[in-house]
Amino acid sequence: MTQQTLYTVTVYSENQVGLLNQISIIFTRRQLNIESLSVSGSAIEGVHKFTITTYSDRETMEKLVKQIEKRIDVLRAFFYTDDEIIFQEVALYKVPTDKLLDDRSIEDLIRKHNARILEVNRTYTVIEKSGHPDETQSLFEELSRYDVMQFVRSGRVAITKSTVEHVSIFLSLIHISEPTRLDVI
């Protein structure tokens, strides 16, 4: 069996209904589990960015990205290892307010983990932590002894360490070489 590495796939596309389903089918056909997913607008007007993490090997990732790029609404797709990108996720923790008021060590945990309090009411307090998955998980484990009422973690958001977004170069080359539907972007 080949070595499995966590890869981050970024897909740049036009904002079209059903594209997420088409992309997830490609992952399913290759028997790849999506570990995290986030979709938003990108720095380029009219272009959306999908950020997807999955465990796989390099050869499978190359094939996956080529297959994703065959979709008509996909502009470009790339894959990266963790050392090629800067990434974060956001986690929210809901803990009982009375535990926070009765035990000062929760405040110390919040400071230690560089987390922040988003909301406090009589019943619960919501704490936010951004960081890598191991950091958000570590805070969850430490808060667990205080009866975490709810815990949720976002999908990964990532940018490359490159000085320019790779899709920008691609779009400028297309714009120069031939007029396409992208000219309206």
Task: Cite the ranges covered by each PLM segment.
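Helix-adjacent hinge/juxtasegments
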Residues: 57-97
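Helix N-cap motif at beta-to-alpha junctions
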Residues: 16, 54-60, 98-100, 131-136
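Short glycine-/aliphatic-rich beta-strand segments at the starts of folded cytosolic domains
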Residues: 5-13, 49-50, 85-97
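Single conserved hydrophobic/aromatic residue that forms the stacking wall/gate
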Residues: 174-185
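Conserved short beta-strand edge segments in small beta-sheet-based binding/regulatory domains
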Residues: 72-84, 115-121, 147-161
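Long, charge-patterned amphipathic alpha-helical coiled-coil/hairpin "stalk" segments used as oligomerization
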Residues: 82-126
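Short amphipathic alpha-helices in soluble, non-transmembrane regions
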Residues: 23-25, 63-71, 105-111, 139-144
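Short, charge-patterned binding micro-sites
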Residues: 34-56, 81-87
